[in-house]
């Protein structure tokens, strides 16, 4: 069947190409050096057919290249600003129509629905009888009352919209988030999702499977990712200066922000998810975070973080996969991540109080590199088993180099440094 369908599609395309080559091979649009949108690269009034539906897609003329955007992309920017401050969602049935400039709500209007994202003042000004009003991120159904008016609320909706703001109320740029990071001015991207979700739905309920239980399971996961992520972000970033929750729903999330806060967010999400699921060992999450310069394209950062997430899910240790976190390309189990974060905080305190120099950090990085090099070299040998490689790596040059460097550091810190050495070597945490 699939082969027949592909053949039919190819035959149709061939016939069109023979009868009207322009529809297949173009040219499309009008070209020109400065008439396209800098965001989506669309030319004015493209794709073809918009005019036939009463729609236009102008590209704003602007002296600054960054401001040259089409009506759709500009409307998405306005949508993001409204979502960040949303208090109510208003749904209104209208006659299906298409007219004016192409914007984010044009598709909804074509389907006979208008959606408004408003605060309380706008709601009171625009509300009409018959509108459906949903309260955002506040599970209450009491009506809105002000100025002698009463607006009924029919439902509530969780909306993961945690957004960082500047002092003037504008949404912070990626450069601001990067500069607000601890240490190096980079931003981080974080992707996370629930492990084995398909298996969870197909096998997790066993003989107790029913439509209502399946729906409850789905709603419970959505409630965590859509309703609770805002709370987690607020606790980590009370001044809304570091984290931007771009998406969270169903069983996964995407967030960006100051790199140190992004790592903390990943740890906190995993911790709270375990509490939410009563520490059920069958319900786990994996994550991946990437590190980028402030000019790095956001969509590419999301892709890189997604690739790191997949690597974390595929990472094997002790015969199991998933339930892991990929920190800038290095897969770790969650316990090791917490251990590393604890030592990061301690070493940062030493640096702040001049108890060690920055060279100390570079020495540790060099030792880790030595460990990786010898591990890769031994792993290429076919005469050694995986267990033999692991045992030999633990007695190579990096070990006595570590002991030597730590012994030369501040005498006041020797007790802590000895513990660090024991944990690195005894628990095989040099990565």
Which residues does each PLM region occupy?
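Charged, helix-rich terminal subdomains or tails
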Residues: 1-431
């Amino acid at each position: 069947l699939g082969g027949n369908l592909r053949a039919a599609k190819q035959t149709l395309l061939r016939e069109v190409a023979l009868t009207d080559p322009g529809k297949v091979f173009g040219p499309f649009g009008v070209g020109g050096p400065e008439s396209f949108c800098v965001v989506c690269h669309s030319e004015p009034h493209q794709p073809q057919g918009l005019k036939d539906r009463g729609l236009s897609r102008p590209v704003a003329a602007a002296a600054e290249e960054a401001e040259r955007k089409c009506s759709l992309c500009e409307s998405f920017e306005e949508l993001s600003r409204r979502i960040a401050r949303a208090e109510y969602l208003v749904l209104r049935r209208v006659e299906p129509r298409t007219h004016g400039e192409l914007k984010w709500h044009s598709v909804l209007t074509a389907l006979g629905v208008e959606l408004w994202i408003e605060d309380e003042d706008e709601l009171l000004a625009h509300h009409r009888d018959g509108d459906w009003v949903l309260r955002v991120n506040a599970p209450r159904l009491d009506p809105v009352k002000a100025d002698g008016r009463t607006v009924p609320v029919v439902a509530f909706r969780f909306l993961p919209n945690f957004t960082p703001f500047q002092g003037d109320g504008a949404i912070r740029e990626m450069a601001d988030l990067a500069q607000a990071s601890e240490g190096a001015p980079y931003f981080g991207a974080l992707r996370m999702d629930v492990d084995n979700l398909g298996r969870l739905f197909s096998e997790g309920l066993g003989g107790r499977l029913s439509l209502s239980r399946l729906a409850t399971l789905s709603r419970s996961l959505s409630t965590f990712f859509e309703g609770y992520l805002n709370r987690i972000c607020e606790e980590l970033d009370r001044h809304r200066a570091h984290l931007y929750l771009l998406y969270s729903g169903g069983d996964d999330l995407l967030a960006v922000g100051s790199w140190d806060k992004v790592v903390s967010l990943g740890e906190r999400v995993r911790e709270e998810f375990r509490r939410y699921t009563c520490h059920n060992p069958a319900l786990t999450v994996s994550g991946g975070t990437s590190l980028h310069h402030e000019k790095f394209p956001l969509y590419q950062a999301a892709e890189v973080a997604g690739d790191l997430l997949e690597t974390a899910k595929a990472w094997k240790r002790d015969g199991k996969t998933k339930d892991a976190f990929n920190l800038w390309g290095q897969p770790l189990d969650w316990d090791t991540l917490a251990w590393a974060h604890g030592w990061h905080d301690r070493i940062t305190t030493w640096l702040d109080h001049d108890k060690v120099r920055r060279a100390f950090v570079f020495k540790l990085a060099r030792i880790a590199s030595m460990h990786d090099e010898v591990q890769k070299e031994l792993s290429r040998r076919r005469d050694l088993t995986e267990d033999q490689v692991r045992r030999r790596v633990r007695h190579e040059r990096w070990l006595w180099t570590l002991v030597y460097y730590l012994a030369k550091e501040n005498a006041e810190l020797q007790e802590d440094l000895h513990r660090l050495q024991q944990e690195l070597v005894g628990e095989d945490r040099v990565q």
